């Protein structure tokens, strides 16, 4: 296997040479490594430096980069696992080069997690984490970290695949990125509560090509009940921008109060807050000292997530303006107009044209048209 050196954060490691002319270069190497996931890995290192779990499992290590970085930059006991025998020599070589006390195993991830528990478990498969979620929950003492890259099924572009994998109906809406994140959160919640455990989102976010969940798992029937109380549906009008949030497991038939069209249920999904402001604040305070390559991007993400309203959906206000046949205002003008009208409003990390607000739809329409400018 031909390898080259790469560096992320303060960690230097070996990765396989990729064919840069391929349609998806990471898939051309014998062992998988995706450079575009550096932000994801940086966020993991930063979060774990705050949480300080007693040990950590990188359940699907591939090159082992994520686990290597956690061991080297966070300084906690790490196990790196991969079921591919071809990946193990490279992981071991990287461990030896760094002189790290890391345990390396070659196991099926589910089998390992059924037999052994870790304080923090990281599941980062190629595609959907759904087949590994139950084992991940059973093998996690406190912190469960999940990545999904099957954004098309999660966001409703591949509807039947989304229903099969997550037992939920996605929605290909103007806020499909948030739908995907909340569908995945809802799925993990339902898998967790059957063990009389609950979930507490610490830092969950979505990018163009992946969704990342960082969760604290809590114990007891009451914790499970609190999680169930945060599950429900979004009822979306197929014609206009109207939607409403509906807690509970069984959505009734409803019609849009503006169009009269039947509302389409999206879910079940997670309706609660997707991050902990306390944890995000601690991550921001620690960020400048971590030497991360995506520091500026991560700082922007953390700031936006802290300011983002906890509502369960957002508006792509450019898309709404197109429906209204008007030119969209500047986003700050729109936010100020909504606030001046007495409502909360914020940007969203999902999209540069995403706006969250608790304003009724007519107020949002007027603000986009410029009728209630401050």
Swiss-Prot record:
InterPro entries: SAM-dependent_MTases_sf (IPR029063), Trm1 (IPR002905), TRM1_arc_bac (IPR022923), tRNA_met_Trm1_C (IPR042296). Zn(2+) binds at residues 237, 240, 256, 259. S-adenosyl-L-methionine binds at residues 41, 66, 82, 108-109. Keywords: Metal-binding, Methyltransferase, RNA-binding, S-adenosyl-L-methionine, Transferase, tRNA processing, tRNA-binding, Zinc. GO terms for molecular function: tRNA (guanine(26)-N2)-dimethyltransferase activity; tRNA binding. Gene3D superfamilies: N2,N2-dimethylguanosine tRNA methyltransferase, C-terminal domain, Vaccinia Virus protein VP39. Residues 4-368 form the Trm1 methyltransferase domain. Its EC number is 2.1.1.216. Coiled coil: none annotated. GO terms for biological process: tRNA N2-guanine methylation. HAMAP family: tRNA_dimethyltr_TRM1 (MF_00290). PANTHER family: N 2 ,N 2 -DIMETHYLGUANOSINE TRNA METHYLTRANSFERASE, TRNA (GUANINE(26)-N(2))-DIMETHYLTRANSFERASE. Belongs to the class I-like SAM-binding methyltransferase superfamily. Trm1 family. Dimethylates a single guanine residue at position 26 of a number of tRNAs using S-adenosyl-L-methionine as donor of the methyl groups. This is tRNA (guanine(26)-N(2))-dimethyltransferase. The lineage of its organism: Archaea, Methanobacteriati, Methanobacteriota, Stenosarchaea group, Methanomicrobia.
């Amino acid at each position: 296997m031909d390898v080259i050196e790469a560096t992320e954060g303060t960690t230097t490691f070996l990765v396989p040479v990729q064919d840069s002319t391929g349609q998806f270069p990471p898939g051309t190497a014998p062992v998988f490594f995706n450079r575009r996931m550096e932000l994801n890995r940086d966020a993991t290192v930063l979060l774990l430096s705050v949480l300080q779990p007693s040990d950590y499992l990188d359940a699907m290590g591939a090159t082992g980069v994520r686990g290597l970085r956690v061991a080297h930059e966070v300084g906690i006991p790490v196990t790196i696992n991969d079921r591919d025998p071809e990946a193990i020599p490279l992981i071991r070589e990287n461990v030896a080069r760094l002189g790290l006390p890391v345990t390396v195993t070659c196991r099926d991830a589910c089998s390992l997690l059924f037999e052994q528990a870790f304080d923090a478990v990281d599941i980062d498969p190629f595609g959907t984490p759904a087949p590994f979620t139950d084992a991940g929950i059973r093998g996690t003492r406190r912190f469960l970290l999940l990545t999904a890259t099957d954004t098309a099924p999660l966001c409703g572009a591949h509807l039947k695949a989304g229903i099969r994998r997550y037992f939920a109906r996605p929605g290909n809406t103007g806020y499909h990125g948030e739908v995907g994140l909340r569908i995945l959160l809802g799925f993990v919640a339902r898998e967790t509560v059957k063990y009389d455990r609950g979930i507490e989102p610490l830092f969950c976010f979505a990018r163009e090509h992946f969704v990342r969940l960082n969760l604290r798992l809590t114990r007891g029937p009451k914790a499970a009940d609190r999680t169930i109380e945060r599950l429900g549906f979004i009822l979306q009008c197929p014609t206009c921008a109207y939607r409403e949030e509906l807690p509970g497991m069984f959505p009734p038939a409803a019609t849009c109060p503006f169009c009269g069209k039947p509302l389409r249920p999206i879910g079940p999904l997670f309706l609660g807050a997707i991050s902990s402001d306390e944890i995000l604040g601690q991550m921001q305070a620690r960020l400048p000292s971590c030497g991360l390559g995506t520091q500026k991007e991560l700082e922007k993400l953390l700031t936006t997530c802290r300011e983002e309203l906890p509502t369960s959906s957002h508006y792509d206000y450019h898309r709404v303006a197109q429906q209204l046949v008007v030119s969209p205002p500047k986003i700050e003008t729109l936010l100020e107009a909504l606030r001046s009208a007495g409502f909360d409003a914020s940007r969203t990390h999902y999209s540069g044209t995403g706006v969250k607000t608790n304003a009724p739809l007519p107020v949002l329409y007027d603000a986009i048209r410029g009728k209630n400018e401050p």
